[in-house]
Amino acid sequence: MFKYLKFYFFIIFLIFNNHSHAVPEASDLKLSNNSINEFFNYISSQRKNADRFLVTLDGTGTFTWSCPQTLCFPAGELFYAKPCSKKHEKKKCKIFAKGRKIVWSNSANMSQNSINIKQSISLTDVKKKLKKFGFID
């Protein structure tokens, strides 16, 4: 009986141990003005590390996922992307930021230090930072 129990826990661990949420997106994304404003609203408010900011692949739609509890479990990207896709007529969505850290890599010069954004940053500075990394023209 104990062997079967260990086997079931092992299978459950494999199913829920999806690391796709840890892989940054790497493609050319251009954000619309509305998406930039929504991103600014997202980073200007109180954020937890578990919060996610998602964008559609065309950069026109956004979705904010906020952890409703104090402690949230890590989930795969599909968990976060489903409600975003539903909101935007089945357009594919990807995670753009986790907490205040941009995880979508648009350019080779993005380093881990340069993608953190402070809560007190102005909209103009956000636009400059997004332009620097190729998210806006």
What are these regions (language model features)?
Residues 1-22:
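Classical Sec-dependent N-terminal signal peptides that target proteins to the secretory pathway
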Residues 21-137:
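Secreted/extracellular ectodomain signature
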